[in-house]
Amino acid sequence: MTFAKITQVAHYVPENVVSNDDLSKIMDTNDEWIYSRTGIKNRHISTGENTSDLAAKVAKQLISDSNLSPETIDFIIVATVTPDSLMPSTAARVQAQVGAVNAFAYDLTAACSGFVFALSTAEKLISSGAYQRGLVIGAEVFSKVIDWSDRSTAVLFGDGAAGVLIEAGASQPLIIAEKMQTDGSRGNSLLSSYADIQTPFASVSYESSNLSMEGRAIFDFAVRDVPKNIQATLEKANLSAEEVDYYLLHQANSRILDKMAKKLGVTRQKFLQNMQEYGNTSAASIPILLSESVKNGIFSLDGQTKVVLTGFGGGLTWGTAIINL
């Protein structure tokens, strides 16, 4: 049996930092209003870099830090809902930028659950024995799809990218247990339409739009459905909530994390948090938190730490992977 392991982490965010006070100059809001409701203080906003640019910087760092040749990468998966273009994929652009000429590459679209879905997929590619090494990256430039006049959504999101190098050769499974879910019937509660349908043959025209969100519906979904998903995954792994060392959840709202910890009966300190500096970076939020945690020495990649990764967001999608790091 081939087991996969995460052997390297990296993250990158644009240099431009936009604070709550900065936002108060362009919309009717203030620092206290934003922070008290979200836990967000700052976010990094691109001044020109696109999604593939952010992802490529992460990919290059992963390869460089591992002293690898780009030609040894077998696959690249980029989780994103803000691609540079429909074709080519963001992953294909990354493959070209880093020179991973032997890698197949594709995007995975699952919004804020994207990194967890992508990691699950990559782990199966490795454990099948067909591939030895791949990059899994979450990358978003949400600033290009936000309505900057809508304070209910514009204050929430940031831009960034992060990822992992996943390789064969572990002595234990990377994923102890997992549970991925989707409910498309609730998809309109978090929506970003991409393109018009305007042809001579169309009976109805669908116009593109900026991001729209039913905030209360999404909050209720997060605090109701997601803890059940985590608990079900813990049961599959035969673990209690307290036996997990750290919980790395999608960084959407600090109040959501407060309620998650309470529902699971876990001390809040186990729920790591960095949304105060990055905002909601969608598919990039979990890997940014993972990369920062390793870089800051909170835990290492020695296989001795049990971590819950949980994403939740548009689709609606949500999923948990309990992993050995």
Swiss-Prot record:
Pathway assigned in UniProt: Lipid metabolism; fatty acid biosynthesis
Pfam families: ACP_syn_III, ACP_syn_III_C
Keywords tagged on the record: Acyltransferase, Cytoplasm, Fatty acid biosynthesis, Fatty acid metabolism, Lipid biosynthesis, Lipid metabolism, Multifunctional enzyme, Transferase
Coiled-coil regions listed: none
GO molecular function: 3-oxoacyl-[acyl-carrier-protein] synthase activity; beta-ketoacyl-acyl-carrier-protein synthase III activity
Known EC number: 2.3.1.180
Free-text function comment from the UniProt entry: Catalyzes the condensation reaction of fatty acid synthesis by the addition to an acyl acceptor of two carbons from malonyl-ACP. Catalyzes the first condensation reaction which initiates fatty acid synthesis and may therefore play a role in governing the total rate of fatty acid production. Possesses both acetoacetyl-ACP synthase and acetyl transacylase activities. Its substrate specificity determines the biosynthesis of branched-chain and/or straight-chain of fatty acids.
Family statement drawn from the similarity comment of this UniProt entry: Belongs to the thiolase-like superfamily. FabH family.
Name of the protein in its database record: Beta-ketoacyl-[acyl-carrier-protein] synthase III
Source organism of the structure: Lactococcus lactis subsp. lactis (strain IL1403)
Phylogenetic classification of the source organism: Bacteria, Bacillati, Bacillota, Bacilli, Lactobacillales
Gene name for this UniProt entry: fabH
